[in-house]
Amino acid sequence: MNVWKRIAVLGFSLLPSLASAASADVHLEHANIDVGNVQSLQRGAQLFHNYCLSCHSAQYMRYSRMAEDLNLPPDLVVDNLMFAGEKVGETMTVAMPAADAANWFGKAPPDLTLTARQRGVDWLYTYLKSFYVDPSKPLGVNNLVF
């Protein structure tokens, strides 16, 4: 997988993959990702940092690598995406202790760095679009993919 495709996957769609496999009866939608749309990839990276990185790490991706791949100056990444004193050469980890996360969520949220490589881009896209309100679940939502 080329660098742009990896960045597209990270920036566009890294969200919980969990350990379970996708159900065989779930139709996977095609993810039409334009890896040449750098602005979209940059917005995806910002969304990932703002909404996912609080619980999910991306421990195999460095901030500096993301900045290089998304044509972002490192100081812009530090000013806009790094809020806890991280260094630009560090990997994207979370401060939440795994034991606390397991207590709060039932298990620690998985690292998302390699999710697209493991499950595929279409799985991620379908997963993101498959949430629905389910009052019977502890968090009030469920997903058709698993």
Can you say where each PLM-predicted feature lies in the sequence?
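Thiol/selenol-based redox catalytic cores and closely related redox-interacting motifs
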Residues: W104-F146
